[in-house]
Amino acid sequence: MRKKTLLYLLLAGFVLAAAAAATGYLQFKGNAVGEQYELYVSRQADYGAVVDSLRPRLRHRAAFDLYARRLGLEQSFKPGHYVVEPGMSVVEIVRMLKLGLQTPVRVTLQNVRTPEQLSERIARQLDIDTAQMLSVLRSRKVAREMGFTTPEELFSMFLPDTYEFYWTATPEEFMRRMKREYDRFWSAGRDAKLKRSGLSRLEATTLASIVYEETRKTDEMPRIAGVYVNRLRQGIPLQADPTIKYAMKDFGLRRILYRHLKYPSPYNTYINRGLPPSPICMPSAAALDAVLDFEQHDYIFFCARPTFDGYHNFARTLSEHNANARAYAAELNRRKIK
């Protein structure tokens, strides 16, 4: 009888131990989360904030705390952007945070006109302070390191696109990546076209920025680029309305009036011949390619169509252009656009 009792006790103990082992295994190495969760750990975050954001989504919180203490996570977690996937275990989550196994984020740069806008756009998508990024963009030293003369010229290095970065990328890392993208863009057969056009990279980018602000119609961009190339070659001021808006920093200006044309600025192409000192926006790749493959014609004027369809009427003579301009102005008046 005693032997049977002892045997039962041993079996019960074995079952309990096995159950405990299985439970422990499941808690540490089993599925700890039921849905995907993105975790952003900033450089300023403390361990408590990290754990507090994770705990509500964890099935095995005690196991997480125990394993995190065992690995010293409190003193050594890495900042970054982490994606906690369904099916991940406590062990995998803790190790991910300790080793800094980040998931890159997608950073989109588009429709940017000024360094201030660019720094704000970057700061919204990466763990970078706006003021710190703007300081880098305005640094003459950084401009020279990137191969440019001035911070204004440095702005021509940035190309609109979507890039992958680690969320914790520093301003310096961001700049080096953008320089590589810039060199890659131009080395893809575009430098050869530059030589044929007689423009430098900076000049082509600056002209492309004007073309981009004039139209979003990619099929019309080469023709508009051709107008400006003709004006440059003939020594005629570009008289580009978007440069007035940039000079005045009034990007919502809907109608350029005579009083605006005298605004004192090196970016005002009504009072200054040639190109502005630097781009007036971040032009699209299509606008850059339109400058490199500009349409050869003899137009030197263009004016928005009164149909407001985004396209333009082109002219070879001032009288033709004035007729187009009067038709457009009449439509502006009819629509009460001032």
Label each residue range with its predicted role:
Residues 1-239, 244-249, 265, 281-286, ...:
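Conserved catalytic or metal-liganding residues and their short signature motifs at active sites
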Residues 260-272:
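His/Glu-based metal-binding/catalytic segments typifying zinc-dependent metallopeptidases
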Residues 302:
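Active-site-proximal loop/helix segment associated with metal-binding centers of metalloenzymes
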Residues 250-257:
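Short acidic/His-enriched helical or mixed secondary-structure segments at domain edges of catalytic enzymes
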Residues 237-238, 272, 277:
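Mature, solvent-exposed C-terminal subdomains and processed small-chain segments of exported/organellar
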